[in-house]
């Protein structure tokens, strides 16, 4: 009888542990790990993201001269991968967005690097003001990928 109770307890424990693991997996939400951009000229793109967006370069495991990784959040990175055969056009609606304290101050930096910018409609260099009061501008990196910079309070 003691053996039956002992094995029953083990069986019930295993079932409960398995079920709790499944529940934990269902409750786990994915977190953004990285965004990868395929670039034509890694050196030029690296300078852009390092100098214009002032992103911090982080070590990458390949060390093959074809990758640059940047820290873009506590747990997220931007990966640049060299190998694109050409620069291709991209739609502005597909973009990466970074928030800054002041869009006006960021525009000064864009002007310093002679980087063209537009609003969401594409008809002005002035920032778009969203219905929630956030200012935003758009510009392109050396490979034509669109970037939004706004002053959203996170």
Where are these regions (language model features)?
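Vicinal oxygen chelate
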Residues: 41-43, 96-143, 154
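Exposed loop/turn and edge beta-strand positions of beta-sandwich/beta-sheet ligand-binding modules
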Residues: 64, 92, 133
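N-terminal beta-strand motif that seeds the catalytic metal site of vicinal oxygen chelate
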Residues: 23-43, 94-96
